[in-house]
């Protein structure tokens, strides 16, 4: 009997070892690690594909499930589609600027770029079902600026391939937005961004709108890397969403074209650009320090549902190789990756058709402001992916 019990115990032990080995092997196979870069590329594609695959066929308005804030102010819901497209393209333009290759990432980029070029044409074609809301409301000034930003960020890949009719339609729509008198807030930079792109496109531009935005941004600097949004400081993340990235982008464009603003010299303007970059570096350091060891960060102020848009300046510093020496590249990459994984691991960020939903971590409609819709979320879901525009061989 003792021999039988001993043999039985040996058999159970062997079976447990075999079962554990098989289970471990299966688990290892399922949970294969992917690189940070692969994760970023997959997330960018996941966010962008539902929008561009539909809009490339003129079917975005038909198939997008529009979601507005519970406190919506009553403006036309059609602003959603322009917000969706403009913010998305500004966010992924740096990544789409990379050359084609035969990697899985390269195939995703190529597909998105092909869809994007067709979508750009639909956006300004009055005969298309997806012609955007250019000529009503004031909101189009905002999202036209993001479209202009996408062209500046990837001119060779996204602007130059467009046919001449489409280019002229954009120039006309951009110029017609001068009907909107922007308030003395970050909105001045939207006007300046559009006029800067018209300068880049060798079209007629309004230098006064650029100069006004530059002058006011300089006046609104309050110290330690922060600008106020107008005369009164607001403790929110609009330095990330708009002010810092657009101010730098506008100054770079003006200086690249050697256009002199009123009562200035090119040397003075270059100092303004350099100072804006230094301030963005300081602000980037603050943003990086906001990220806790658990990959959380403080959420405050309006537009909390813009998610990763908080880190646009930090990602832009990576993309442009402008990180201050105090911020090692690997540290920033790891911090941003961990934040992305924590945010998007929560259920409810996407609806059943794959579009982003209102919320911060998951589906949280109560966080949305009176002007927010799920189109507003798109750019800010992708904006921290600017760094993915770096070649895989770079040290970042």
Task: Cite the ranges covered by each PLM segment.
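Long, charge-dense tracts
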Residues: 104-105
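Glycine-rich phosphate/ribose-binding loops and adjacent secondary-structure elements
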Residues: 284
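Aromatic-lined, polymer-binding surfaces characteristic
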Residues: 81, 92-95, 109-280, 289-315, ...
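Extended polysaccharide-engagement surfaces of secreted carbohydrate-active enzymes
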Residues: 306, 316-396
């Amino acid at each position: 009997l003792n021999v039988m019990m001993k043999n039985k115990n040996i058999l159970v032990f062997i079976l447990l070892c075999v079962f554990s080995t098989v289970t471990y092997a299966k688990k290892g196979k399922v949970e294969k690690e992917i690189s940070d870069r692969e994760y970023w590329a997959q997330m960018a594609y996941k966010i962008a594909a539902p929008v561009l695959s539909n809009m490339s066929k003129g079917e975005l308005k038909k198939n997008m499930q529009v979601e507005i804030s519970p406190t919506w102010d009553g403006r036309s819901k059609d602003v959603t589609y322009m917000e969706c497209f403009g913010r998305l393209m500004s966010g992924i333009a740096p990544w789409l600027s990379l050359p084609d290759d035969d990697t899985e990432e390269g195939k995703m980029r190529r597909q998105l770029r092909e869809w994007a070029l067709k979508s750009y044409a639909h956006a300004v074609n009055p005969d298309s079902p997806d012609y955007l809301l250019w000529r009503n409301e004031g909101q189009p000034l905002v999202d036209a600026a993001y479209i202009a930003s996408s062209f500046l960020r990837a001119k060779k890949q996204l602007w130059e391939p467009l046919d001449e009719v489409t280019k002229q339609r954009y120039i006309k729509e951009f110029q017609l937005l001068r009907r909107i008198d922007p308030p003395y807030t970050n909105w001045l930079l939207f006007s300046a961004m559009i006029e800067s792109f018209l300068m880049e496109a060798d079209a007629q531009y309004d230098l006064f709108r650029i100069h006004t935005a530059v002058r006011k941004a300089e006046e609104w600097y309050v110290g330690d890397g922060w600008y106020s949004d107008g005369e009164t400081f607001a403790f929110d993340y609009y330095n990330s969403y708009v002010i810092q990235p657009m101010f730098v982008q506008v100054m770079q464009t003006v200086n690249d074209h050697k256009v002199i603003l009123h009562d200035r010299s090119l040397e003075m303007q270059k100092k303004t650009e350099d100072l804006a970059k230094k301030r963005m570096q300081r602000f980037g350091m603050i943003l990086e320090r906001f990220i806790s060891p658990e990959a959380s960060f403080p959420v405050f102020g309006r537009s909390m549902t813009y998610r990763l848009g908080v880190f646009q300046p930090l990602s832009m510093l990576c993309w442009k190789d402008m990180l201050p020496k105090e911020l090692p590249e690997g540290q920033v990459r790891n911090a941003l990756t961990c934040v992305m994984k924590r945010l998007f691991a929560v259920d409810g960020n996407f609806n059943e058709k794959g579009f982003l939903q209102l919320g911060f971590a998951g589906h949280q409609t109560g966080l949305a402001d009176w002007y927010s819709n799920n189109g507003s979320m798109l750019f800010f879901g992708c904006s921290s992916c600017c760094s993915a525009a770096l070649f895989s061989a770079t040290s970042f």
